[in-house]
A protein has these predicted regions:
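Basic, polyanion-binding surface patches
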Residues: 1-186
Length: 186
């Protein structure tokens, strides 16, 4: 049996925590589908490495175009960094790096190196100034193509960037996607 659910917020719905339905749609808590966790890395205004734990993104492409599509709130400093610098990296940590990846939330400060402070290693990128994370087996370097609000009046913006370079560890270079996912331990 399927339940038919209206998409408007029910009047009797209690928030998970204060403001949770202002930051997220209430449907995010009902229609939970697993997404790959990534660390979106940028440079702060002072040049320090920034790392944003992220799960609202996808990769899509056609022919010679491969695009990173992210959803970000306009008041996050990662969003401001992307608009200012016009670039970022999407780094995919394995399960082994999840503790450090989640630590980026706790070491999120205006001027510090969030990557190093979370126990990860900054790695230079090849085509962009945004740093990569050495421990991640897959990193995609991206340049901003466009950004726009999700809907009128939303603080959530869609950000699209062309992937201009890919760094991939030997352990995940195989062509079989199932083997790659297993090796990456996503």
């Amino acid at each position: 049996m399927k339940h038919e659910i209206e998409v408007t917020t029910p009047n009797n719905l209690e928030e998970i925590w204060p403001g949770s339905y202002d930051l997220f749609s209430w449907l995010d808590y009902v229609v939970t589908i697993p997404n790959a966790i990534s660390l979106v890395t940028t440079r702060k205004a002072n040049g320090a490495p920034n790392a944003c734990l992220h799960a609202w993104g996808m990769l899509v492409g056609d022919r010679d175009n491969y695009t990173s599509l992210l959803a970000m709130h306009d008041y996050f400093h990662t969003y401001a960094n992307i608009l200012r610098e016009g670039e970022w990296c999407v780094n995919y940590p394995s399960l082994d790096q999840y503790p450090q990846s989640f630590q980026t939330i706790n070491v999120n400060h205006p001027d510090n190196d969030e990557i190093t402070d979370a126990g990860l290693t900054v790695e230079a990128s090849k085509k962009v100034q945004a740093p990569r994370i050495a421990e991640c087996m897959l990193s995609l370097e991206c340049k901003l193509e466009w950004h726009r609000p999700l809907c009128e009046g939303s603080s959530l913006f869609l950000v699209a960037g062309k992937v201009v370079h890919v760094a991939m560890d030997d352990r995940v270079m195989g062509t079989d996607p199932a083997e790659r996912m297993q090796a990456m331990r996503l």
